Amino acid sequence: MEAEGSSRKVTRLLRLGVKEDSEEQHDVKAEAFFQAGEGRDEQGAQGQPGVGAVGTEGEGEELNGGKGHFGPGAPGPMGDGDKDSGTRAGGVEQEQNEPVAEGTESQENGNPGGRQMPLQGSRFAQHRLRELESILQRTNSFDVPREDLDRLMDACVSRVQNWFKIRRAAARRTRRRATPVPEHFRGTFECPACRGVRWGERCPFATPRF
């Protein structure tokens, strides 16, 4: 019985020794792995300046209960993405506004001042009017041949006809105003204004009796 008890103690001690050796080997492997990982992190931080400082600041903020390097105000990729999206949106707006600006500039260059271009040939020029007045003063008549005026003024016939119609209407108005209004109620041959009126009809220039 004593031999069996001693053999059990020996086996227990051997098992404990094996466990301790395996645990020590595992600890050694873990320390080597962590050391290799820290060396890689240090090399990466040296290759990218400023990363280590950012990492330490982030760890300190997380420990102190801060927001860390995540969120809209973080200086990491999220913040840069917002800036990039803002610049892209601004570029799209500028591209949309540029064709409109070019169109307005072309319109302004084609029609300066936003004024409508006058129709050509709508009115006589000042020198043409002076020329007509001088011709009428020399001839002292409205019966000047229109073909001669067309040839002298180098103008179309319709424009000269319209101008003569306006001048004749103005001359008739001035003649009527200068003629005295007759003081009678029926047309007579003595009235210069109503000689063409039939006998017994009212004169167009007659005034009412009452």
Curated annotation (Swiss-Prot):
Compartments (UniProt record): Nucleus
Induction / repression: Expression in embryonic stem cells (ESCs) is dependent on DNMT3L, which mnaintains a low DNA methylation on promoters, allowing its expression.
Region of interest (Disordered), ranges: 1-119
GO MF annotation list: DNA binding; DNA-binding transcription activator activity, RNA polymerase II-specific
Record InterPro entries: HD
GO cellular component: chromatin; cytoplasm; nucleus
Annotation: DNA-binding region: 117-175
Protein known as: Homeobox protein Rhox5
Natural source organism: Mus musculus (Mouse)
